[in-house]
Amino acid sequence: MPGRERRDGGRSADKNDNNKGRNDRGRNDRNNRRGRGRDDDRNQYIERVVTINRVSKVVKGGRRFSFTALVIVGDGQGMVGVGYGKAKEVPAAIQKGAEEARKNFFRVPMIAGTITHPVQGEAAAGIVMLRPAAPGTGVIAGGATRPVLECAGIQDVLSKSLGSDNAINVVHATVDALKQLVRPEEVAARRGKSVEEVTPTRMLRARAGQGA
């Protein structure tokens, strides 16, 4: 009869089917939770694809094509990273670039939405100059510099590209400039002065209003 044990100690088919169904549902629930966790981590970051290129490799049988993607990822609150992905398909290249960008995260010092002091970054032939700006100025930047600044959460800044227009060089020059930024406390400690002596009055007022 259904639901009863057989004399040889085995269980009837309907019980085995029920147990299998419960196990499958449990595995599916766990997989769904893992998938939601990955989606939540991905959604909390800002992603910008700067450039996608098709590259080829000459092999014995002909040419093999693949794609490269330069991706910027940031949380919009001071954390930003740059990644370069390569794959046979565009979505896979973008995903690899985003994963590498998360591994390369670094913190950008800011005061009231702008950078702490003027700075110039260089990478190969790319040269990018950044200057602090008053509230309401916005991000005055173009080309490949803008997505880096926006992903970092910088709201007011002046920038100028002085070298190569190559997107990869410009992005890495911008990153080099941002990595050179230091907080006023670090400058004061290095010079043996107070924070008020090394920080412009406008930034001190903005910092006081920010509650930093």
From Swiss-Prot:
Pfam families given in the database record: Ribosomal_S5, Ribosomal_S5_C
GO molecular function: rRNA binding; structural constituent of ribosome
A single GO cellular-component term on record: small ribosomal subunit
UniProt cross-references to InterPro entries, sorted A to Z: Ribosomal_Su5_D2-typ_SF, Ribosomal_uS5, Ribosomal_uS5_bac-type, Ribosomal_uS5_C, Ribosomal_uS5_N, Ribosomal_uS5_N_CS, Ribsml_uS5_D2-typ_fold_subgr
Biological process terms in GO annotation: translation
Region: Disordered, residue numbers: 1-42
UniProt entry keywords in alphabetical sequence: Ribonucleoprotein, Ribosomal protein, RNA-binding, rRNA-binding
Keyword DNA damage attached: no
Stored NCBIfam families: rpsE_bact
Subunit annotation: Part of the 30S ribosomal subunit. Contacts proteins S4 and S8.
Domain observations: The N-terminal domain interacts with the head of the 30S subunit; the C-terminal domain interacts with the body and contacts protein S4. The interaction surface between S4 and S5 is involved in control of translational fidelity.
Family membership: Belongs to the universal ribosomal protein uS5 family.
Function: With S4 and S12 plays an important role in translational accuracy.
Protein name: Small ribosomal subunit protein uS5
Organism: Corynebacterium kroppenstedtii (strain DSM 44385 / JCM 11950 / CIP 105744 / CCUG 35717)
